[in-house]
Structure formats: C-alpha cells, structure tokens
C-alpha cells in the first residue's frame, strides 16, 4: 500500500491570479534547487516533499504537519471547467482546492461559481487572498512568509489588509462557510483558512503550501492510499491532435499503474471503446527540451498520481471527463464505465428541460444544480445542441411552458438545430458560466409564472363595491343604465352584483367614460354603467351600494392564495361580502371545497 500525492486544483475568477500562482509555485520549486526538483506531468506538476520543506521552512513543524505525504500534485489547467472535467465516481478528482480571490476586488461571478462547485463536490479548500502587493503602501519582501512580511508593514497597511480579509470572511459566512485568517483559525475542521498572498512576489506562498499539507493530513489519510500494482484508474482531461503523433489523450491517473501496451477502456459519445496503448508520453525536463526539438519523452509506465499523454488508435471520439480503466475483465470494465455514465445521464424525468454540456463533469454539475432547484430534466447529454434536442424540448413544451427550454453549457448549436429553434417557441440558454445560466433560467421561469398568475388573477372575481349616483339614471331596464362611483377595488365587465341583503341584482354588461368603452374601473372613478337584468326603482335604487357577488370557490382562492395581492381595503371588503353572504347561508366561505 502506497500513499500518493494529493491532487490540487486552483479555482477562481478570471484575472485573479490562478495561472500566476501555479507559475510561481513551479518557479519556486525549480529555484529552490532541492534534491529531486519538480516532476513535470502532462497537465500537472508534482512538487515533492523535500521541495515543499525547502519552501515552507519551519512552518510545517509550527503547524504540527508530519512528513507523511510524497508531495503535492497540482493540476496545471486552472479554473472550474478543468475541475469539473476531472471527475471520478462520487465527486471531483481533485482532493484539495485553492480558491483564489483578488483581495482588492473580492468575490466576482466566477468566484461564486467556483465556490458553488466546491460545495457541491464537498472538496476541502483554502482561500488564497491574492495581490496583497497591490494594497496601497505595501512594502514587498519577495518570497517571504506572510507573517514575516506582514509584521514589516505600517500599521495602516496592516489594518487595510485585515479589513479586506474580514470582507472575505463576511462573504464566505453568507455562503455558509466559517472562515478566518489562517493564523487565527481555532479549528481547521470547521473553519476555512484564508491565506493572504502575492502570486507575483511569492509572499505568503510558504503558508499556502503549509495549509494545503495540513488539510491533506487532516482529511485525506485514507483516500490517498493506493495499490501501486493494481490496474490504473484515471480520467480523461483532453483529447487533442499533436503534430507528428496524431490524436492523443491527456489523462490523470489517480490509482494504480498504467503501462505501455495496456488495453484501456473509455467512453465515446456513443459507447465504451477499448484500445491498446502505443506510447506513454511525459514532458521532457526543461533543460532537455532546450537541447531537443521534441516536447515529449517516452516512458514504459506511470504510477498514480500521474498526468500522462497516451497515443493509441481509434480515440478521436473519446469524451473529456470519461473514466479511463485498464482492461482486465472486458465485460466488468464496460459495465463499470457505463454505470458511471448512466448515473449522470439517465436519471431523467418524463417531462422537463433539455440539458447539454461539453464534458461529463460539467453535465454532472449542471444536472445537480437543477436537481437542487427542483427542475425536472427530460434529457441530459454531452455534445452540441442538435435538432433532436429541439424536438425533445418541443414535446416537453406541450406539458408545461417552463419545460420548453434547452440549457446549453459550453457547447454550440448545430445549424439544423438553430433553424429549428427559429421556427419554435423553445427558449435557449447558452453560456459558459453555470450559475449565470441558472439565474437566466430562473428569471425566465419567474416571468412565465408571473404571466400565468396575472391571467389567473384576471379570471378570479375580486372584491369591489360601487354606489349608484342619485339623479344619474339614463335607462330604467334592459339593461339598466346609470352613473356609478367605484368605492373599493376594481370593477370589471362581467362581474355579478348583489345588494347588502345578499340578493343578486344583475351583471356588469358595459361601462363608459366620456364616450369611451371601458373593461374596468378603479376606486374613485365615476362611469356610466349598464347592468344586465337590473331594474331601477325595483331591484336597484339610486344611492344604493352594490357589491361584487364573489363565487365561493373564488373567495377561498383569494383568501388562501392571493391575499398578498389585495389591498387592506379589499381584504376588509372581502370580510363584508362574506358577512352579507352568511345572512342567507351561515356556512358560506367557512369550508374549503374538496
């Protein structure tokens, strides 16, 4: 049983310093000239323990971190796209993460996105509060630990930094994470460590690496144990063409051993495929790369954790994010891969939205967020939006308008689908920031629900009262026409009217004001009203107050579901109308209809 290096991913908003941080960590490792140096992998950099000790100095001892790990394995492709692509069953491939935030700008949209993804995958993380060298008045001490450089700053600069750190603490608290500046953390199990750093000057990097080692020691003892002789398990990071090599696969191996000539199984958009490895390639060390034009060198085998380039036939359609397995039992491996894919793709509903994404990991992330929002999903798949997707969304639209949507993350729309969309009522949400897609979808659904509610509200007969103005009778009957004043609420064409004894006297047939026909009239308005079935001097009289005769089922809907949309005056009138109705039927409005 061997302990592998924990896999570390760097996430954060664009321009907040993800790539600069990775470059600096690599540069520090090379410059430290410690025994062993760094090991360059495809898509990753491994920094061995003796190099970390050289960078961190006494911090490992100060924080009681034992030297039980071989080092740290950094994924070179920063950002949450790589984080979600690099997945394995049950969660993210990364064991730990650095959430990098510009201390001067604070949280930005992609910071929020990254935090949501870390929460979703339950990945332990630290916050690197970057660009402390940009704080006004900061005096740079290249490569020094944060505590040392902080102690050499003016008191005003120290206060500025602490204010900015506590702004991050507040923001993380809003998101449900308790956090503190790393040297003030009292419980590393329940608090997120914030490490102020400069990725450019290297200040704070020793503490950042120390905190990562501490997290690994605390959380990852068991999951870092691997059988180095067992068949390799990994994840596809990218499928790409290399000059002179043809199509190649970049993969991260997180368990076992991978050898040249092994048969490996992976997922394409259609099925599981198997192929035999022709070559395993790793980057040449920098000094060798200067002497040779070749970027890669061949190796016979790699042991986890490892980033490797694989040359093999028939891999053009392999999906990024697909599991990679060495084939020992073909049927068993096939079932294992299919089962893992089905977990994401097939858990769909009879009716719901269509979801398309570029990789398995991003599809999994989008589906999980939609599930948390209780949004049903009809189709969840990988690849560009096709005509078939539009047809599926059209079928879902028949069920409910809010299902007539395609959520497309990081994918294109093929021309035939674009044409089909033009001729349909399907709504397309397309982008590369998951949370923004979700926000846009939610906003669209809210608009539809508001529209539905508005139509529903219009269909519900609401409380209103009118007074028949004396000496303004234009016709006695068929229909009775006279001047009225609206006392409460809004009176509409078609509303039934009753008197204060609860007797129905007629229906509002039409209304006019200065010769203009009206469909409704509001409180304070005086209009000419035609009342069907009413007779002035017999069923209605000048000066009478008439009330809208609300049907009992409408009364319950208003009372139980729409009371928030009524004014206090209208609610009081509802009680008055109920009181009038109960003169004839004491139980009126008391029992909800079943």
Swiss-Prot record:
The keyword S-adenosyl-L-methionine does not apply. Residues 198-200 are annotated as: G5. Residues 130-133 are annotated as: G4. Residues 3-220 form the tr-type G domain. GO terms for molecular function: GTP binding; GTPase activity; translation initiation factor activity. Residues 12-19 are annotated as: G1. GTP binds at residues 12-19, 76-80, 130-133. Residues 37-41 are annotated as: G2. Keywords: GTP-binding, Initiation factor, Nucleotide-binding, Protein biosynthesis. Residues 76-79 are annotated as: G3. GO terms for cellular component: cytoplasm. Function in general translation initiation by promoting the binding of the formylmethionine-tRNA to ribosomes. Seems to function along with eIF-2. Belongs to the TRAFAC class translation factor GTPase superfamily. Classic translation factor GTPase family. IF-2 subfamily. PANTHER family: EUKARYOTIC TRANSLATION INITIATION FACTOR 5B, TRANSLATION INITIATION FACTOR IF-2-RELATED. This is Probable translation initiation factor IF-2. The lineage of its organism: Archaea, Methanobacteriati, Methanobacteriota, Methanomada group, Methanobacteria.
